[in-house]
């Protein structure tokens, strides 16, 4: 596959659930901000053409990266919500990106994406007229709570999935979905929800359980544990679980903050 897919990374949020002075995407793990691993995971795929990062106005923590693994990294101003940031990124993509081209959307603080998962998402999603998302089947027993905190019942889990990212959609359809949701005053919590609102049915592509989002200190500790115990990238472990972030060289990132996570630091 040639580099034809752009990825949008919404990174304008403050991560209030995590606490602390830094937005969670800039928290350090293995000596580098989480977002360095996120961008490296995306850029490792040959189909990726570039990355658009939606950052907050006046973001003093943005390292100023302009490329990763020779793939361009562009920035635009994000909005007050995730949906607004993604829409801003969609509208700011280069003129070469057509309306019916597929685009990826990936969480800035979801740094543990495996190359095999991204490859499978692109292969399946680009064969569908709508697109697809990475997701994981719900395996725990689900309880429905009453107002008093008691259990009102047990929910069937056979058809329930947890939505992950990346999510892959055609540019013009996602713009329409996000725009209509905003006009209706509906806060969508992921891009698939915006697509559902306009009557479209994306596919579910099963992804790895360890493609988690860092939202709490425990999540950060889990990712640091993953780094400390990870083999050094593709070729040294089962390729189905290889994480390209492990083998990114220190010269992979360009721009003012051009240090990237190298294997010697992991």
UniProtKB/Swiss-Prot annotation:
Involved pathway(s): Isoprenoid biosynthesis; isopentenyl diphosphate biosynthesis via DXP pathway; isopentenyl diphosphate from 1-deoxy-D-xylulose 5-phosphate: step 2/6
Record's protein name: 2-C-methyl-D-erythritol 4-phosphate cytidylyltransferase
SUPFAM superfamilies: Nucleotide-diphospho-sugar transferases
Site feature location: Positions MEP for the nucleophilic attack: 157, 213
Role played: Catalyzes the formation of 4-diphosphocytidyl-2-C-methyl-D-erythritol from CTP and 2-C-methyl-D-erythritol 4-phosphate (MEP).
The organism of origin for this protein: Xanthomonas axonopodis pv. citri (strain 306)
E.C. code: 2.7.7.60
Region (Disordered): 229-266
Catalytic reaction annotation: 2-C-methyl-D-erythritol 4-phosphate + CTP + H(+) = 4-CDP-2-C-methyl-D-erythritol + diphosphate
Short name of one Pfam family: IspD
UniProt-annotated site: Transition state stabilizer, residues: 17, 24
Similarity section: Belongs to the IspD/TarI cytidylyltransferase family. IspD subfamily.
Keyword Transferase: yes
Residue ranges, compositional bias (Polar residues): 243-252
InterPro entries according to UniProt: IspD, IspD/TarI, IspD/TarI_cytidylyltransf_bact, ISPD_synthase_CS, Nucleotide-diphossugar_trans
